């Protein structure tokens, strides 16, 4: 995922972006289960009204790419948003060396991705679709009145990620309001998902003729996937 991480960092290093270091005490109250925020109780829905809405997670062992825990916001904060708008959330994880074989390492990475299903900030109802990488969020009127911010939400996510001893650093980005950027990031989310599916295909040890494999475009584009296939003992044909 390293090339994708570099692209994300370049794309989201926009002037005017707000950024905060990780502060566990700034995490919002977690309810332990997803809260039902009804339409009449919502101030607005991030990604609602057919706006783009995406999320994805990238993992790296390169500490230079993700050197610290940080929350970054590109766009208006929760209190400044007045209605449904484009939205995207991106998480970059720096992990330490994962022991075990490739399958165990891959399983560990997948478990990190599932953290997003275990964060339940009060007044912030996430609706995540793994099929199309969409993430819509209903924000309650009460949470807005109480001063909920993306700094709070980001700290809540990082706090949950830090429960995993394999994770060294977390950087989380929230993008709001910019349709073009959110559309681009939604496309990146699909690319990241394709990489993950290809890794899963390789880890299953499936021999394949590269000329007919549906994952060939991904292997051609992403450095290291073909080498991993060689390592698994299934030399691709017609490379």
Task: List each model region and its residues.
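Ordered core of a single globular domain
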Residues: 2-16
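Short loop/turn segments that flank or connect secondary-structure elements
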Residues: 14, 20-25, 29-30
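Long, charged N-terminal interaction/targeting segments
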Residues: 27-171
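Short Fe-S-cluster ligation motifs
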Residues: 176-180, 237-239
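Cysteine-cluster motifs in flexible loop/terminal segments that predominantly coordinate metals
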Residues: 183-231
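N-terminal cysteine/histidine-rich coordination modules
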Residues: 214-215, 235-239
């Amino acid at each position: 995922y390293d090339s994708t991480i570099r692209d994300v960092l370049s794309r989201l290093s926009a002037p005017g972006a707000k950024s905060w270091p990780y502060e566990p005490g700034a995490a919002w109250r977690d309810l332990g289960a997803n809260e039902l925020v009804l339409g009449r109780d919502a101030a607005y829905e991030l990604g609602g009204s057919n706006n783009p809405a995406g999320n994805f997670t990238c993992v790296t062992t390169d500490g230079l790419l993700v050197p610290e825990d940080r929350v970054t916001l590109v766009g208006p904060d929760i209190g400044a948003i007045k209605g449904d708008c484009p939205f995207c959330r991106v998480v970059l994880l720096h992990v330490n060396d994962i022991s075990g074989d490739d399958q165990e390492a891959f399983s560990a990475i997948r478990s990190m991705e599932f953290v997003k299903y275990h964060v339940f900030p009060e007044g912030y109802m996430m609706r995540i679709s793994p099929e199309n990488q969409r993430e819509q969020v209903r924000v309650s009127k009460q949470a807005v009145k109480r001063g909920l911010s993306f700094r709070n939400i980001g700290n809540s996510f990082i706090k949950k990620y830090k429960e995993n001893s394999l994770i060294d650093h977390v950087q989380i980005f929230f993008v709001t309001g910019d349709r073009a950027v959110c559309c681009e990031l939604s496309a990146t989310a699909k690319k990241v998902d394709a990489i993950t599916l290809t890794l899963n295909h390789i880890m299953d040890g499936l021999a394949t003729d590269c000329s007919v494999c549906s994952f060939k475009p991904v292997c051609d584009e992403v450095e290291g996937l073909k080498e991993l296939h060689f390592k698994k003992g299934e030399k691709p044909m017609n490379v």
